[in-house]
């Protein structure tokens, strides 16, 4: 039994937002294992995090692409954060990428923050890269996957909004995506298929997260 074997109910607890990180200099000291969520703007990161912990408004959702401009940290409530009473896990909502209409200086700032975090965080156990099941992997997604490979950061693809895709199209996308991942050495081979709106694939995602932090 690992130290994380008893955490199966952790996603039923109340979770809280603890801080937003606008630049790499504001990162908290490395402590509990971190699980990060990356994806294009409006791919559904905030909605998926809310569904994951069964809270409607933990992570802010917005119809405005690029609203999330910081690394947003969430932890289960009831831990002081002091040595000896650290939370067992932290979830990190990363700034969305691929928003072409954002000012270049903002895009550059977000890019630097994301890349610096990925390269230098030893407590980062896995990045879940969210891909809209209606569109598949786009160039911006591919660039992020290449970066994760170079940084040797373990990541796993999560297809979102699967309820909005016909079953035959979804099956085809899964096959195409798995084939593309064969060229990415840091990619976890298993795809996760989810829908925040229909609560599909959430148990599988929770189990994958617990497995990732136990490694």
UniProtKB/Swiss-Prot annotation:
GO terms for molecular function: GTP binding; metal ion binding. Disulfide bonds: none annotated. Pfam families: MMR_HSR1 (PF01926). Keywords: Cell cycle, Cell division, GTP-binding, Magnesium, Metal-binding, Nucleotide-binding, Septation. Residues 31-215 form the EngB-type G domain. GO terms for biological process: division septum assembly. GTP binds at residues 39-46, 66-70, 93-96, 160-163, 194-196. The keyword rRNA-binding does not apply. Signal peptide: none annotated. Its cofactor is Mg(2+). Mg(2+) binds at residues 46, 68. GO terms for cellular component: cytosol. Necessary for normal cell division and for the maintenance of normal septation. Belongs to the TRAFAC class TrmE-Era-EngA-EngB-Septin-like GTPase superfamily. EngB GTPase family. NCBIfam families: GTPase_YsxC. This is Probable GTP-binding protein EngB.
